[in-house]
């Protein structure tokens, strides 16, 4: 169904955003 496709797309994009945020925070911590 279309709903499942949208749901999985939202989940994957959220996971990517979380991964980027964690990587950014780790880089900031290492920079200091």
UniProtKB/Swiss-Prot annotation:
Annotated membrane topology: Single-pass membrane protein
A biological process term (GO) from this entry: photosynthesis
Subcellular location: Plastid, Chloroplast thylakoid membrane
Pfam family, one: PetM
GO terms, molecular function: electron transfer activity
Record-annotated membrane-spanning stretches: 9-27
GO cellular component, one term: cytochrome b6f complex
Primary localisation category: plastid
Keyword terms of this UniProt record: Chloroplast, Electron transport, Membrane, Photosynthesis, Plastid, Thylakoid, Transmembrane, Transmembrane helix, Transport
Family recorded in the similarity comment: Belongs to the PetM family.
Function, in words: Component of the cytochrome b6-f complex, which mediates electron transfer between photosystem II (PSII) and photosystem I (PSI), cyclic electron flow around PSI, and state transitions.
Assembly and oligomerization: The 4 large subunits of the cytochrome b6-f complex are cytochrome b6, subunit IV (17 kDa polypeptide, PetD), cytochrome f and the Rieske protein, while the 4 small subunits are PetG, PetL, PetM and PetN. The complex functions as a dimer.
Protein name in UniProt: Cytochrome b6-f complex subunit 7
Protein species of origin: Pyropia yezoensis (Susabi-nori)
Gene expressing this chain: petM
């Amino acid at each position: 169904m279309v709903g499942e496709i949208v749901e999985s797309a939202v989940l994957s994009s959220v996971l990517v955003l979380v991964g980027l945020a964690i990587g950014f925070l780790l880089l900031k911590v290492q920079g200091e």
